């Protein structure tokens, strides 16, 4: 299954929330990303069907491939954030971009 940028964003967000909170629910993801619960439910379903996520007792878990992709996206995000900060962009803005 082809993973689009939005799917990558969801996987990265799940990874970040797991690192921060340990366990992640759909409602946590909705709050973090600023999306509606139905939008998150749809995306979770697509990612689950693609083999990137599993859901167990209401908690989201990255599969091996989902985690690999999320880690790559997160590393890329950190690299570009650092480049923006070095270029003089405020850290808060660099994190958002």
Go through each PLM region and give its residues:
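Basic amphipathic alpha-helical segments that dock to polyanions
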Residues: 10, 29, 40-48
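Helix-turn-helix/winged-helix DNA-binding modules
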Residues: 20-22, 75, 86
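Amphipathic alpha-helical dimerization/coiled-coil segments
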Residues: 78-97
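Conserved functional loop/turn residues at catalytic and ligand-binding sites
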Residues: 14, 51, 88
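N-terminal helix-turn-helix DNA-binding core of bacterial DNA-binding proteins
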Residues: 2-35
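Basic, amphipathic "hinge/linker" alpha-helix immediately C-terminal to the N-terminal HTH DNA-binding motif
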Residues: 58-76
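Residues at alpha-helix termini
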Residues: 32, 49-50, 86
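A short, conserved structural fragment
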Residues: 48-58
């Amino acid at each position: 299954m082809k993973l689009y940028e939005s799917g990558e964003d969801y996987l990265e967000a799940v990874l970040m929330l797991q690192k921060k909170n340990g366990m992640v629910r759909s409602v946590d993801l909705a709050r973090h990303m600023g999306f509606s619960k139905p939008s998150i439910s749809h995306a979770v379903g697509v990612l689950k069907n693609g083999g990137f996520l599993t859901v167990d007792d209401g908690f989201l878990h990255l599969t091996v491939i989902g985690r690999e992709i999320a880690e790559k996206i997160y590393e890329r995000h950190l690299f570009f954030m650092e480049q923006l900060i070095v270029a003089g962009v405020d850290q808060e803005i660099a994190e958002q971009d």
